[in-house]
Structures are given as C-alpha cells and as structure tokens.
Amino acid sequence: MVTATHPHSLGRLSRMRHLARQYAALTKPRVTQLAVFCAIIGMFLATPGMVPWPVLIGGAAGIWLLAGAAFAINCLVEQKIDALMRRTAWRPSATGEITTRQTLVFSAILGGAGMWLLHVYANDLTMWLTFATFLGYAVVYTILLKPATPQNIVIGGLSGAMPPALGWAAVAGEVPAEAWFLVLIIFTWTPPHFWALALYRRADYAKSGLPMLPVTHGERYTLLHILLYTLIMIAATLLPFVYGMSGYIYLAAALALGAGFLAYAWKLYRNYSDELAQRTFRFSILYLSLLFAALLVDHYFKFVPQV
C-alpha cells in the first residue's frame, strides 16, 4: 500500500533543510574544514602510533564546534559590512534571514557543546586553549583589530594559526616546540593567503570601509608584502626538518610547494591581474593542505639516512 506525503509536510521539511543550510553557512564550513584538518594533523603528529578514537572524534568535533561558534559571531558582528560586499551579501546574517538573537543562541550552543566535548574526550588544557582561540578570533580579531588596522590579518593571525597546537594538546596534554612550529607555519601563511584574496576583492573591501592593506596602501605595496611574507613562510616550513621532527619526505614537499607558492607571488609582483590573484589564493589553500599532509606521511614513513 502506497501512502502519499502531505504537501504541507514536504514544505515544512524543505524549509527545515533550508534553515539548516543557513545556520551551517554561519560557521563558514570551508574555512572550518581546513582548520579541523590541521588540528587532526596535529593530533597524529603528537603520537608515534594511532590517536585514540575517542580523542580523535571527540576532540575534532569539539574544535569544529568552537570554530563554528567563532565564525558565527564574526558573521554577526560584520553583518552590515557583509551586506555591502558582493562576496558576503548572501550570508543569512547579512540578509537578516537569521536574527541577531538566533545567531547568539546558535553560537552559544555550538560553543558550549564544543567545550563539553573537549572536556570529556580530550583534556582541560585543550578546552581552555580552544576557548582562548575562540575569543582571539571572535573578539580580538573581529571586533578590535579588523576595523582598526591594515595589519589586522598579521596581528590577529595567531587565533587562526592555533588548530595544530589544539590537536597536539588534545593527544599529548601539552604544547611543545614542535606544535608551535606548525602554528608558526600557518601564522606566516595567513598574510599572503588573505592578501591575495583582498587584492582581487579590493573594490568590495573599499566599499565596506575595512582598512585592508590593498585599500590603505595600494596594490604594489601589498604585492611586495605578499612576496616578503612568502619568503618568511618558506623559511618557517623548514623548521620541522631542522629541528628533527620530520625527515626528507617532508623537506622535499616543503621545498617543492614553497617554490610553487613563490612562483605565484613573483608572478603577481611582476605582472598583476585579478585572475592571477584569485589563482594564487586558491593555490595557497591547496599548498597548506598538501604541506600538512606531507607532514603526516613523513611522520609515519620518515626517511632519515643513517650516518
């Protein structure tokens, strides 16, 4: 016997799915995925064996939820700015589809659940470090730095660079020098990554009133700083090998990927175009993903010739 689904039920289900997608959009899923990926790599690098499943799943979920909570607050604070920019005008906080109160409640639920998961399945160090990262992004970067200085992405970049240290702490209960090397890599990667985006979206940022480097200092100044920070980033990526935490598999990957990033930065500096800046931005995401994947492969298949 076949029963028909009532059209009102279908409409209600469709609205619920749409609302779920809108709430998910507040968490900036693509950015969150990259952050959690780096945190998971940090977990595996913290131990010579397998990460315990409860820590892996519970810890990653907790970091994911707190990251999503921070991004939701970011969307809330910048809702008027987002409404002015073509890149972000579709966000539910900017359109008003999700209200201020709903966003605050949503962020509080995500943050509370994330803290609980980290307390239960990881440890209190990870819980408080992740909460500090939440405050660093949602308050220090979003509210204080971003509207105040063109160096916002440099000064405030630490919060976005923390995921590997959070993952490491979840497994080891400490944050040693090796974990801070990973943080430094992301910290130095962030300016050239973000400034490439800001260059080809500079009209949007000029309209928003945010003091982004291409708007306040111009194209050539920004291109020079992308090139300089790329060189600093490449130097930072060599630290895991120099310190002995990685072997030649990682070194080869770091040098090859660094050469690719430097080539993009140099081409941008010599012959800028919005299309090339967009390609550089996209490559920077691939770069970080492959670099951390190489760290993981090297960790389990380290090749260091015996002297």
From Swiss-Prot:
Disulfide bonds: none annotated. One of its GO terms (molecular function) is protoheme IX farnesyltransferase activity. It is found in: Cell inner membrane. It catalyses: heme b + (2E,6E)-farnesyl diphosphate + H2O = Fe(II)-heme o + diphosphate. The keyword Transferase applies. It is a multi-pass membrane protein. Converts heme B (protoheme IX) to heme O by substitution of the vinyl group on carbon 2 of heme B porphyrin ring with a hydroxyethyl farnesyl side group. Belongs to the UbiA prenyltransferase family. Protoheme IX farnesyltransferase subfamily. Carbon 2 of the heme B porphyrin ring is defined according to the Fischer nomenclature. This is Protoheme IX farnesyltransferase. It comes from Cupriavidus taiwanensis (strain DSM 17343 / BCRC 17206 / CCUG 44338 / CIP 107171 / LMG 19424 / R1) (Ralstonia taiwanensis (strain LMG 19424)).
